[in-house]
Amino acid sequence: MRSLRRVLLQLVLLAGVAFRGVRFDDAADAAAAAQGSSDLFELPSPSPTLALPGGGDEGASTEIIAAPWPGRHGLFTPPRSTSQPARAVVQPAADFGSQLQFYDNGTIQLVDLLSKLPRWQFSTGPPLSKHITTSKPDLNYVIYLDGSETSDLIEVHNGSGVRLPWKLEEFIAETPYIRDSFVTIGSKVSTTFVVNADSGEIIYKHSLPVALNEVGGPLVEEIPSKLDAARSGTSANIIVVVRTDYSISASDLGEHLFNWTRTSFTANYYARYGHQDMLAQSSCLRGNIPCIRTEGPPIKLYLPDSSSDNAIVLRPVNEVSAVDALEPLLPPKKLPQPAGESNVALDSAQNQTADIALGHFVPADTELTNSVTKFSYRWLFPTFLMLLIMACLVKLADASKYCRQFVIRFLKPFMRDEKLMDPRGKSEGTSKRRKARKKDGLINSTQIFSASDKEGNGTGGSTEAQSNKAHDSTNVELPNGLNGRQIGKLCVYSKEIGKGSNGTVVFEGSYGGREVAVKRLLRSHNDIASKEIENLIASDQDPNIVRMYGFEQDNDFVYISLERCRCSLADLIQLHSVPPFSNTKGTDIELWRQDGLPSAQLLKLMRDVVAGIVHLHSLGIIHRDLKPQNVLISKEGPLRAKLSDMGISKRLQEDMTSVSHHGTGFGSSGWQAPEQLRHGRQTRAIDLFSLGCLIFYCITKGKHPFGEYYERDMKIINNQFDLFIVDHIPEAVHLISQLLDPDPEKRPTAVYVMHHPFFWSPELCLSFLRDTSDRIEKTSETDLIDALEGINVEAFGKNWGEKLDAALLADMGRYRKYSFESTRDLLRLIRNKSGHYREFSDDLKELLGSLPEGFVQYFSSRFPKLLIKVYEVMSEHCKDEEAFSKYFLGSSA
C-alpha cells in the first residue's frame, strides 16, 4: 500500500513539473534576463502593473509592467504586450535625466543627473527611523527586526529569544500583542504626496489614518486650486509618492519600554505630454528603509530625460484602471525618444505597447511569441485527464484496504492462532519484543515506575502506574466551553498555559477528575520525557517538588500530568515588583518590607527552593536548570515554592559525585555555572551557583548579579558579578558570594545554605548572639577573644555607644559599665537587656520593640554587620562544639 501511494505521489510531482515548465517557460526566461540586485534597497516581487485597455481593437490590451533593470539601481524594464509579449531588454547608456532621492531625515530631493544640482525638494515628515528605549537598566523584553533579508521579528523575553511567525505589517494587524504583563501595540500610517515633477509643488497630500476632525478637509493649503491647475491643460508631469510608517510600541503595566519606527516608500512617475488628458505611468519604485539608519546613500528613482526631440508612439486608452483620479486619455501623442539608431519603435496600428523609457537607450533585439496564449487549449485536457486517473487510483487503494479488513473480520472466527487477529499483520509477541529493544524509551520508564512501587521504598508510592502501550486520542467537548482530547485517563484541554524547549507545551487538563497541568513532549524526545518521569517518581512526596500524578502517550506525544500551580516565581516577582501591585493593601502577599528587605514570606519561598534542592541532592539528582521560571508557586493554601521542569536533570549513580564531560543538558543561558558553560564536569555545585543567582533575583525584584541577559554568560566565565545592590544586607552578600564562587569545590552545600544566617528567624539570631556572649564570658582563649575584638571596625565602627539612644544608655549605666569599643561588651549588653526585657519601662519597651522581632531589628538596623561578622569568627573557632553545631549544619560537608 505504501509503495502504491509513493508511486502516485511521484506521478503528481512529475505532472506538476511538466505543468509548470510549459506554463511559465517564457516568464522564467524573462525573469532570468531581468535578474539584478540593488545595493540601495530590496525591490519587492511581483512588481505593480498599470493596465491600459486597447481603444480600437476589441480583445487586445496594453500593459505596462514595472520590473527591476539588470545591473541598474532603481530602473525598470519597458512594458510588454499581453497579446504579443516582447523579450526586449533596454538598458540605459548614460546618467541623463533626473534622480529622485530619499534622505534619512525624511526629505525628498529631485537631482539633475547631468549637473548634479537639486531641482527641488520637500519634507515628507519626521525622520525615516526612530528608536526610543526606556531608561530602565533592567529592560528584559524587546521586539526588534533582525536586519536580515527576511526582516523577521524577534521577541526577547527574560534572556531568551523567539522568532515571531509574522512579518512587520502582519504583526501590526495582530496587535495588541500581549505577553505576560507586556503589551505591544502597532500602527501603520500611509501618507500620499502628489507632486508636480517639474516644479516640486505638492499638488495633493493625504494621510491615513487621520483624525476625525481632518476627514473631508484639505491637508495642504490651496489644494483645490492646485488640482484645478494640474487639469488645466499644462504639460505637467506628476510624481506620486506614498510614505508608509510602521510603528511598534511596548509597555509593561503602563510603564513605557520602547518604541521604534520603520518606513517604506513607493514612488510612481506619470508623464503628461501635449494634452491635459494624455497621462501614462512610466516608472515605479519601491524601497524599504532600515529601521535604524544614521548615514548612507540616498534611495534613488530615475526619471526620463525629456530634452530629446525624438519620440515614440504611445497607444490611446480609454481609462487608467490603476489610478482612479485620472481622466480618460485622448488620441495618440508622441513621447520623447532617446537618441540613437536601431531603437525599438512600435506603431499604434500594430496593437503593441510602446517602450516608455527611463534614461537613454542602447540598441536591443525584439522577439515575439504566442506560446503563452496557446497553453490553455493545448494542456487543459491532458491535465484534467491525469488528475481524474490519479483520483480513481486513490479511491481504488482505499477500497482495497477496506476489503482486506472485511476479509480478516470474516475469517476471524475460524482462526485458531490469536496472534493472527492483529489487523496490521503483526503478532503481539513480535510487537512486544520490538518495543523491548528500544533504549531510553518510555517503556523503560514505565518498568522503573512499577519497580519502585513494588519495592515500597517510599518514593513514588502515590503515583498511578501507566500502560506501556500508546492510547488513541479522541476529541471531547467540555462543559466550560473548552475543547480537549482524551488520552487514557488524561483529558488535555485546549487552553495553553506555557511553553518550553524542544517543542514542549503545557496545557490545562484533568487526570482522574483532578485538575492538573499537562506537559506535552514530542515522542522524538522520549529520552527527555523518560528522564523527567524517572526523577519525578524518585522525588515524589516532597512538598517542595512538583508532584506527578501519571503520564499517558499517543502516537506523537508524551503527556505528563503534573500538579497545577498558581504561577512561576518569576511571574510572582515581576508582578509584585511593579508599584501598583507591590505590597498591595488587602492582599495576603507581601514580598518586601517597607525598608526594602525581603519579607518573611519571600524568605520562606527562597527557603522552600533550598529545601527542594536538599531533597534532590540527597537522592543524587542534579537539577541542572534551576531558574525563577522553573520554580512554581503552589495554588492552594499558603505560598510554597516547588521545583519543576526536570527534563535535563541527571541522577548520579551510587558512589558518583559528578557527571562526565560528555553529559547532555547544559541549562539556560544566564543561569549556568561556569563549568557548565565550559562543558566541564557537573556536580551538585552547579545547582548551588544557580541558586545564588536566584536568591539575588528575589531580593532585588528581578535583577541579576551578572547584569543584562546578553552579557551574563561572558561575565559568568570571567567571574564578574556585582553585589552592590544588596550591600545593605550583609548576610545576603556573604551567602551569595560563596554560592557564586568560580571554583565549584569552594561552594557550600545545600544543607549549609538552608542553615545560613540569611534564613535565620529573629529568635534564632538572638539565641546565637546570646550563646556567643556566654561562650566568651567563660573563656580565657586569647585567639577567640582577639578575633572577636578584631571585627569592631567593620561591626560597629569602634564606638557602638554613639549609635544607641540616650534612654537605653541611661538604663544600662545604672547597673554596670560597658566599654563602647569592645565587641564582647556589646554582645554582653544584648544578652543582658534581652534577659531583663520584662523589667523595662513601657517607654523603653516601645523604643526597643517586641521581643524578639523588634529587639533584633533595633540592634541590626544600627549594627547591620554585627551578626555575620560574629558568625564568621565563631564558624572558624567553635563550629564543631556541641553548643554551636545547630548553627553550622552542613558547613563541614
From Swiss-Prot:
Localisation: Endoplasmic reticulum membrane
Q: What is this protein called?
A: Serine/threonine-protein kinase/endoribonuclease IRE1
Swapping residue 519 to A leads to an effect described as: Loss of autophosphorylation
Gene3D superfamilies named in the record: KEN domain, Phosphorylase Kinase, domain 1, Transferase(Phosphotransferase) domain 1
State the Gene Ontology BP annotations: IRE1-mediated unfolded protein response; mRNA processing; response to endoplasmic reticulum stress; response to unfolded protein; RNA splicing
* Catalytic reactions of this protein: L-seryl-[protein] + ATP = O-phospho-L-seryl-[protein] + ADP + H(+); L-threonyl-[protein] + ATP = O-phospho-L-threonyl-[protein] + ADP + H(+)
Q: Which organism is it from?
A: Oryza sativa subsp. japonica
For the Protein kinase domain, which residue ranges apply? 491-759
Its biological function?
Involved in endoplasmic reticulum (ER) stress response. Senses unfolded proteins in the lumen of the ER via its N-terminal domain which leads to enzyme auto-activation. The active endoribonuclease domain splices bZIP50 mRNA to generate a new C-terminus, converting it into a potent unfolded-protein response (UPR) transcriptional activator, which then induces transcription of UPR target genes, such as luminal-binding protein (BiP) chaperones.
Topology with respect to the bilayer: Single-pass type I membrane protein
Which family does the record assign? Belongs to the protein kinase superfamily. Ser/Thr protein kinase family.
Write the gene name: IRE1
GO (cellular component) term, any one:
IRE1-TRAF2-ASK1 complex
- What does the record say about PTM? Autophosphorylated.
